[in-house]
Amino acid sequence: MQLSLQNRRYMMGVVMCLIFMPPGMWVTSLPNILETHDASWLLPYATALPPFGMLVSALIFGALSDRKMHAERLLGILGISGAFFLWFGFSSLKWGWHPGWYLVFQGVNAVISGPIFALITKVKLTNLPNASKSFPIYSMFGTIGWMLGGLLTSQLGLDWSADAGLLAAYIRFIMGALCFLLPATPPTDFESRGWRARLGLNAFGLLKIRELRVFYIASMLFAIPCVAFFMIVPIMLVTFGSEHPTAQMTIGQMLEIFAMLSLSLLGSRFRVRWFIVVGLILGILRFGLFALAGELGMLSVIWVGIALHGPVYTYLYVTGRMFLDKRVPDTMRGQAQALFQLLIGSVAGILGAFSCGWLYQGTVSGGAEDWTLFWLALAVFSVVPLVYFLVGVVGKPAAAKI
């Protein structure tokens, strides 16, 4: 199929929607799905699996897209192959196999899926004209996809069913096939040699740049407590009487659309760093609202906290990718995004899964039911990356592109 360049750019919006729709269906449903299959004990390990997989593959595939292979083709191969293991993972639960098999299949899927977000980011930022305006708009299609996935799951009554994961796998397969219709994004680094280049380890050289180092570390620290959002909030919703937790978790995506539009309209008028600061502040406020909901016992306050997830994600992580792209050379684009995904998704994901799980066991589970203490502890921790970023980046002059 031959498509014009403009139509291939439009295809980026379709692919973004289909990338985020599958996790929107099963990620927020997973705590309840595992409970249905008497496997709630698996939740911390299942939450930590994607970060572990990303730890293995993100930098390697990021370097591969910079050095050897078209990013859109690599994205298609990973999308299709990952769909099979996603399907087997949830099928193993339906078939009544030991829950450990779910970890095995999802572990392979995690390795395959780890580079996907970094690769689609590279494709968009490489091919979009006026990225400061158009990048948030195309990212908004991912928001719509996640929201549609959650709403469809609840509409079909799959909030507690492994069928949510099977349907997600079918959509993931279609996404992978459509990736081959994306704009061509060829490799740009033809000079790097050696095993460090092959493994993507040259990306760690970016940490020598003060501004990038502070941004990477602050983002990673903030992402640690954020793991509790998808890991614990669905449980909190059910505890407080929600009958459709997966659909209600999409409230954040509704506000995220407006945040994306505001970023597109205002991104060229204000420095990117200030959007990141706003995202960090709203993240702390979000945890504060969850703590207040625990004190008042009000489901509506939880909904307000969920709504803030949209601006938090947009102003910190979408803007953060733009922040990086402006500060690295073309030959490091894929690896810079892969390192970002590695730190916020892998390192922070692993630390967050176990630390938030431990904190939950000590404050909420086992009859304690102290939701307020749980969320206040996360709010206090989130102040650390905010202060670090304010001192290390906002308080310093902007660095030039290296």
Locate predicted features.
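C-terminal ends and interior cores of transmembrane alpha-helices
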Residues: 80-96, 282-295
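Helix-loop boundary and gating motifs at the non-cytosolic
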Residues: 2-52, 211-250, 317
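Multi-pass alpha-helical transporter architecture, strongest
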Residues: 89-93, 172-186, 346, 374-402
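Hydrophobic core of transmembrane alpha-helices in multi-pass small-molecule transporters
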Residues: 17, 98-118, 123, 220, ...
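Juxtamembrane intracellular "pre-TM" segments in multi-pass secondary transporters
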Residues: 1-6, 182-219
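Helix-to-loop junctions at the C-terminal end of transmembrane segments
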Residues: 56-70, 157, 259-272, 360
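C-terminal transmembrane helical hairpin of 12-TM major facilitator-type secondary transporters
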Residues: 274-320
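A membrane-interface helix-boundary motif in multi-pass transporters
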Residues: 155-172, 358-382
